[in-house]
Amino acid sequence: MWPVVDEAHRMSAHYSSWSGEVAETKRFKLGRLLSETAHHLLLMTATPHAGKEEDFQLFMSLLDRDRFEGQYRQGVHRTDTKGLMRRMVKEDLLTFEGKPLFPERKAYTVEYELSPAERDLYEQVTDYVRTEMGQAERISQAGDKKRGNNVGFALTVLQRRLASSPEAILRSLERRQYRLDTKLRDMQRITEDAQSGTALDFAADVLPAFSVDEFEDLDEETTDEERAQFEEQADQVVDLATAAQTIPELRVEIAILEDLIRVARRVRLQDDDKKWVQLRTILDEQLLTHDGSGDARKIIVFTEHRDTLGYLQAKITAQFGRADSVVTIHGGTRREDRKLARERFTHNPDTVVLLATDAAGEGLNLQRAHLMVNYDLPWNPNRIEQR
C-alpha cells in the first residue's frame, strides 16, 4: 500500500498548555495508522509551517517516529527533516521550456503616519487595554482562567480593530459600552444596594471560551456557516467580557468607554484616515490599476473586520463613482450572494474591486486578480502566504 495524502497538515496534534499531554485529531490518528501499516507514505500540503516547532515535530513523527518521538524543547531539540521533506515554492516551478511557470510576486509594505487625532485615540485605547489586561491576568491567576482568557481576547480584538480603521474601533467601543451599560442596569435591578460595592458574579454570563489560537485555526476548510457562527460568538465575547467584579468597577469602565467613544467619534468625523489615504493612492495609480491597453485590473482588498469592510465599500464606491465597481464577501454573506459576487468580479469589467474577509478564500480563483491588498494583518500570518 502506497497512500498519498493531500492537505496533510490536517493530520495535526499539539501539546496541551495545561497538562502537557498530546491532543491528537482524528486525522492525526489516521496518519499514525497509515504510517504503521503502509510500506510508503507521501504527505503533501501547500500550507506553510505555522512556526510551532513542537507541533511540527509531532507531524513529522508520522514519517519517522523514532527520530521525532518525545516532546520538543527549545534549545535542546532541533527538527531535522533531512531525507524526509522536499520543499517546493512557486517561484522555483518551471515550464517544459525552462521558463517560470508563474509571474514574479512583488510584495510591498505601505507605510503611513497617524494624524495627531489618530495618535491620541491610539494612545488612549492602548492605555485602556493595558490596564484591563492586567486585571485579566489577575483573574486568571486567581483560578478563573476561562474568564481571564475571554477578557484578554476581547481586549486583543479591540486593539486590532483600532489598527484596522476609525469605523471599526468606534463601532466596537459603542457596542461594548451599550452591552455593558445594559448589564449594569440588569445587575442594579437585582441588587439591594448598588452602592455597597458587593462583589457580584459577573462571570455568570454564558459566554463561550475564546482564545487567539481559535482564530488562527480558521482556514479554507471552515464552512461559511461555521465561520459566521464563530464570528457572532466572538463579537459577543468582545462586547461583554469584562474584568469588572463590582458595580462601581463596572461604572468606572463604562465611563472610560464613553470617553473613548467621544475621541473615536471625533476622529471618524474628521475623515482624515491616513491608512485609507494610502489605499486611495494605490487605487488612483494608473500603472498599478490598469494594464498596458488601459483596461482596469482586478483588485482584491482583504480586511479582518466587518465594520472596516462596510467603511471601505462606501469609500471606494465614492472614489470610483459607481456602485457596481465594488463587490463584498464576508462570513455572513449568503451562499447565492457569494456566488453572484464572485461571478461579477470575475466576468464584469466594471467590477474592479473585491472587498473580502477570509470567507472569500473558499472557492475563489485569486489568479483572476492582478493586485492584492492586505488592509489588515490576519490572526494567522500564514494566511497571507496562502492567499
Regions found by a protein language model. Name each.
Residues 55-58, 364-376:
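A short beta-strand element within the Helicase C-terminal
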